[in-house]
Design a protein with these regions (language model features):
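Short conserved beta-strand segments at catalytic cores or DNA/RNA-binding microdomains
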Residues: 5-8, 66-82, 92, 100
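Short, basic alpha-helical nucleic acid-contact segments in DNA-binding proteins
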Residues: 9, 24-25, 32-54
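DNA-recognition alpha helix
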Residues: 10-23
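Mobile genetic element proteins and their domesticated derivatives, centered on retroelements
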Residues: 14, 30, 59, 75, ...
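Active-site beta-loop-alpha junctions of metal-dependent nucleic acid enzymes
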Residues: 32, 36, 85-107
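Two-metal-ion RNase H-like nuclease active-site motif
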Residues: 52-65
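RNase H-like two-metal-ion nuclease catalytic core shared by retroviral integrases
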Residues: 138-154, 166-168
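C-terminal domain-tail junction helix/linker
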Residues: 158, 167-217
Length: 217
């Protein structure tokens, strides 16, 4: 599951890598693991997440699903932490409003400043959800989030497209979670002298911590 969320690998490649290690499963099993365990790992990590910043860059990109495009609303804070992602079949005020409401609920932070492009959906959405936030629009201000989109688009490009919105949401959530875990936005995976993982990078140590937490639950 970690390989799938971290690297640009299809399910069939994960199956092959597991087979090399003596684990024989089919692609549907890997798919089921990703859908089932991704929310569990995210929930287990939640108490260890660094607090999200109050300066948000928000934008939408698109991913392929069942032969059509759907919109991925995303936000990062001033430190580069992925705040949230919300998938929608529409690109309108209702979708933007739902995104802001979800992002605030999940992060438990209300932004002081939000930068967006000039899409007409954002001002009414912000007035409805976080009217106290300062709103800035402009191309320069959006460069960071537009660059950040490439991580998600690169990951989804190696797939053959999603079939259901809910399944796509889990994978996009997991991708952002994995980015944050690797980049140190959780108090997990810090060096602890564990002889089993003396040279392991932060992500592997953090994943090991979470796996032990879930196993003990």
């Amino acid at each position: 599951m970690r390989w799938y969320l971290r690297f640009r690998l299809p399910y069939t490649d994960i199956v092959e890598l597991l087979a090399e290690r003596g684990v024989h499963v089919d692609a549907s099993s890997v798919y089921d693991w990703v859908q089932h365990f991704t929310p569990l790992y995210k929930d287990a990590a939640r108490p260890h997440r660094h607090r999200v910043g109050t300066r948000w860059a928000v934008d939408e990109t698109y991913i392929r699903m069942a032969g059509r495009w759907v919109y991925a609303y995303r936000a990062i804070d001033e430190h580069g932490q992925v705040i949230d992602v919300y998938l929608s079949a529409t690109r309108d005020t209702a979708a933007a409003t739902a995104f802001f409401a979800q992002a605030i609920a999940r992060s438990d932070v209300r932004p002081r400043l939000v930068t967006t492009d000039k899409a007409a959906a954002y001002p009414p959405a912000l007035r409805a959800v976080v009217p106290e936030a300062e709103h800035i629009t402009g191309k320069m201000e959006q460069q960071a989030i537009e660059r950040d989109h490439q991580h998600l688009k690169g990951r989804t490009r190696s797939m053959r497209g999603f079939q259901r919105l809910g399944c796509a949401q889990v994978v996009c959530d997991g991708h952002g979670f994995m980015r944050n875990l690797r980049d140190g936005f959780y108090r997990l995976g810090e060096p602890s002298g564990d002889p089993r993982l003396p040279q392991a990078p932060r992500l592997v140590r953090a994943w090991d911590d979470l796996t032990q937490t879930l196993a003990a639950a």
